[in-house]
C-alpha cells in the first residue's frame, strides 16, 4: 500500500485538515482496565502529531528560528470501533530574532472550554444537548 493511500485513510479518521498542518509521528494502543471502562470500549488509540515546520505569521523584515515545541495538548476525538481516541498534539514554537518573543501558529482544533475536537463536541452537543466531560464517549 502506498504512503498516499495511508494518508487518505488518515484524512478520513482524523479531524478535518489536521494533516495539512501536522505530521503523524506515532500511534499507540492502550488497553483500558475493566474497572475504568464506562461502556463497551476495550482500549484507546493515541495519535501523536507534531506541527510541520512552517510558521505562517511572518512579519516583513523579521527572521525566525525554531525553538522546540509548546507543551503537548491532549484532545479527545470520535471513538474508532470500541476504542477511545486521543490526539497528542505538539505545536512548534519559533523565536522572533528582532523582538526575542516566542511565536507560533494558531489553530481551531478544539471547541472553546473543552478538550474535544470541533466535530466531536458538535456531535456530543447535538446528541446530549451539552458536551459531557466524562462518559461513554469521552
Model-derived features: positions:
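Short, positively charged, Gly/Tyr-enriched micro-motifs
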Residues: 75-138
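Compositionally biased, intrinsically disordered low-complexity regions enriched in proline and serine
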Residues: 7, 22, 30, 65, ...
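N-terminal juxtadomain amphipathic helix
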Residues: 43-90, 95
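Glutamate identity and glutamate-enriched acidic tracts
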Residues: 4, 8, 36, 41-44, ...
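Intrinsic-disorder/low-complexity regions
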Residues: 22-25, 34, 66, 76, ...
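N-terminal alpha-helical interaction blocks
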Residues: 1-55
Amino acid at each position: 500500500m502506498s504512503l498516499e493511500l495511508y494518508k487518505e485513510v488518515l484524512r478520513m479518521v482524523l479531524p478535518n485538515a489536521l494533516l495539512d498542518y501536522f505530521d503523524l509521528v506515532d500511534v499507540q494502543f492502550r488497553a483500558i482496565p475493566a474497572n475504568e471502562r464506562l461502556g463497551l470500549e476495550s482500549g484507546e488509540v493515541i495519535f501523536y502529531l507534531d506541527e510541520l515546520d512552517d510558521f505562517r505569521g511572518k512579519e516583513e523584515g523579521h527572521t525566525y528560528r525554531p525553538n522546540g515545541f509548546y507543551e503537548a495538548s491532549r484532545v479527545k476525538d470520535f471513538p474508532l470501533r470500541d476504542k477511545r481516541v486521543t490526539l497528542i498534539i505538539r505545536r512548534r514554537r519559533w523565536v522572533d530574532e528582532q523582538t526575542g518573543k516566542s511565536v507560533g501558529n494558531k489553530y481551531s482544533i478544539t471547541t472553546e472550554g473543552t478538550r474535544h475536537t470541533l466535530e466531536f463536541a458538535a456531535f456530543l452537543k447535538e446528541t446530549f444537548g451539552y458536551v459531557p466531560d466524562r462518559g461513554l464517549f469521552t
